[in-house]
């Protein structure tokens, strides 16, 4: 996140501890937590772009040692009040590690629906790589944009509404499995595994990518 989009997001006012995007956010969170629970030897987790801390809090309730990082002061304030059993840090996400984390390293980095908002998505991936222990995992979620979904949007006349140019701080990067794979492999991640959520096959709402630092 650089100076162009960090200032917009810092001004975003979180007022509730509820999951972003309502039922969709809750369902996606449940899927993410379920995937993490299937991984062995995961104890410490960092949630990059935690927003109001909803996902961070769900993981903390299940006994994980979780730290949430977000650029929004109001998001961190809501998170600290709602989920006192987790740690929260107010910091911009970029290639430089948050000073508040010191030399801390984690078993897993989680980032849910964040990377599509960033002008420089490689910053998030670099930050995640540096925060992970060797052999640790990065779990990313982002809206899915494959060929057939993009074609369906075009044929149904929904391109303008879907790619909303009037939403300041909205989605500015649109990933397919191929482009996300290229980004992650370029920064040292291997063993990529994709799963999908929402709607029907090839028109999925979100994709979830689990990768490993080698």
Describe each region flagged by the PLM.
Residues 1-104, 108, 125, 140, ...:
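Conserved N-terminal segment of class I S-adenosyl-L-methionine
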Residues 108-114:
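A short beta-strand submotif of the Rossmann-like class I SAM-dependent methyltransferase core
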Residues 140-161:
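Conserved class I S-adenosyl-L-methionine
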Residues 187-189:
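A structural motif corresponding to the C-terminal end of an alpha-helix
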Residues 125-134:
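A short glycine-rich, Lys/Arg-flanked "PGG" loop and its adjoining helix->strand segment in the class I
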Residues 116-119, 175:
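Residue-level signal for the nucleotide or nucleotide-sugar donor/cofactor binding architecture
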Residues 74, 119-123, 150:
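Short N-terminal helix/helix-N-cap motif within the alpha/beta-hydrolase-1
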């Amino acid at each position: 996140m650089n100076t162009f989009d960090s200032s917009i997001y810092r001004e975003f006012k979180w007022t509730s501890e509820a999951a972003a995007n309502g039922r969709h956010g809750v369902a996606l969170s449940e899927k993410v937590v379920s995937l993490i629970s299937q991984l062995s030897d995961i104890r410490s987790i960092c949630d990059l772009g935690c927003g109001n801390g909803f996902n961070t809090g769900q993981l903390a309730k299940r006994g994980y040692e979780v730290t949430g990082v977000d650029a929004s002061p109001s998001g961190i304030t809501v998170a600290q009040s709602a989920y006192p059993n987790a740690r929260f840090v107010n910091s911009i996400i970029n290639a430089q590690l948050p000073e508040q984390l010191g030399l801390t390293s984690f078993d897993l980095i989680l980032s849910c629906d964040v990377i599509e908002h960033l002008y420089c998505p490689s910053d998030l991936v670099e930050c995640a790589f540096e925060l992970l222990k060797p052999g640790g995992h990065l779990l990313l979620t982002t809206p899915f944009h494959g060929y057939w979904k993009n074609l369906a949007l075009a044929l149904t006349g929904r391109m303008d509404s879907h790619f909303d140019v009037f939403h300041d701080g909205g989605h500015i990067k649109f990933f397919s499995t191929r482009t996300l794979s290229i980004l992650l492999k370029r920064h040292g991640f291997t063993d990529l595994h994709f799963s999908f959520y929402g709607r029907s096959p090839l028109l999925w709402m979100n994709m979830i990518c689990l990768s490993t630092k080698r």
